[in-house]
């Protein structure tokens, strides 16, 4: 069996092993490697294929005997293959993945004024793809460049915005790199972040009625391309769509809201059992964190303060994935709770 995986400095939780398990029959593990150990890891011969993530997409290039044309152009490698002679071949599947994400979103790029938020490695990849798709202009927005977050008014006529920054990514959910209401001509929003499923950036797009897409499709599409390189065979494009839909459903929380006494906790427990998911309860979370019952907390602090404690609990639960969440009857009285619960979930009233 081929030995493959994901190389990075700090990886934490990753969906990549689950995606690759759907695509092919090879071992796929996570490899956290310190910068001073990178050369030793790459030359040891201990793997057949490897995805590469930050901060090593450029650092691995000197160890490659050959680069694909796209990797050479972007000077960014996120796929390594060990050839029969032991040398490494470097490729880039991120461009393929982002292009697939754009096509799946239905957002038109040809002839549009586009903004790319962020100036890191992903930014250059996105820039190249947008140009190839015929964007009228592509402007990089960075913190310190000529075009930055302090002069966004220069680009109020932007039609498509792509976020390539980690702003809003788990666990620092709930923040957005820009206020989309500043762009009255906006026609599409793309965010390469995939956890949470809906960042604050795309949640605002949803509220404004602007078409959007999050980064999970890109992750699956680039994994499909990676598997093709690892296996030296074609994989149908339909596999990307299938795996994306499957993961989207599995990752999505089912959130129950309703009047007190409507049976949310009971229904959540039964649903979780039927669907083989974990059942979570915001009231139970509040009580566990504060060492008292909800009734006692309301009596001690008043309802307004209790609702703040409830929102803190909901913020923690809303970051989870693949759960059934029962909420307190009054959670709908605080508007902020909607985004906290919807970022990873579908909300059902019972």
Question: Which residues does each predicted region cover?
Answer:
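NAD(P)-binding Rossmann-fold cofactor-contacting core
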Residues: 133-149, 283-285, 289-290
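Glycine-rich adenosine-cofactor-binding loop
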Residues: 8, 92-95, 102, 107, ...
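Phosphate/diphosphate ligand-binding glycine-rich loop within oxidoreductases
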Residues: 2-105, 196-198, 208, 217-220
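Adenosine-phosphate binding glycine-rich loop
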Residues: 192-252
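ATP-dependent small-molecule kinase phosphotransfer cores
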Residues: 284-342
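Walker A/P-loop
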Residues: 265
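Rossmann-like adenosine-cofactor binding region
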Residues: 147-213, 331-338
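Conserved phosphate-donor/acceptor-positioning beta-strand/loop module used by diverse small-molecule
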Residues: 341-350
